[in-house]
């Protein structure tokens, strides 16, 4: 079923790009005109965003806790954890371990992720980073 194929694609993206620290997954798994939260980033722009996250949290882990699919959309509720080792959101490295959740809705088109809407509590992240 297409829904299962789409869910597998989303799982693969987070596994390869985040857990395996391979931002080149953006080149393989995202559309050339990839859009994130309304901003056209393309593959290169999203790869930069992944690299920024991985530099700030080199041991970043992503666990998809819930994944649902309908038509061309996949929703994933995720748990993230990592150690703050470089600048992130204007906060210099603290060495603090943080954990947060996010929810993403991703659109799959022609076997690639073409769009994502991501919601995470950046206030909670900053609170953990700044104490």
Model-derived regions, located:
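C-terminal and inter-domain tail/linker signature
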Residues: 1-131
């Amino acid at each position: 079923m297409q829904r299962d194929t789409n869910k597998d694609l989303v799982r693969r993206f987070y596994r390869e790009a985040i857990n395996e620290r391979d931002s080149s997954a953006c080149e393989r798994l995202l559309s050339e005109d990839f859009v994130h939260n309304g901003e056209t980033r393309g593959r290169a722009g999203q790869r930069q965003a992944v690299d920024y996250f991985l530099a700030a949290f080199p041991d970043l882990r992503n666990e998809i806790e819930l994944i649902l699919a309908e038509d061309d959309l996949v929703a994933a509720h995720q748990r993230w954890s990592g150690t703050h080792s470089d600048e992130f959101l204007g906060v210099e490295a603290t060495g603090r371990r943080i954990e947060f959740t996010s929810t993403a809705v991703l659109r799959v088109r022609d076997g690639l992720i073409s769009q994502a809407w991501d919601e995470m509590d950046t206030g909670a992240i900053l609170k953990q980073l700044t104490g």
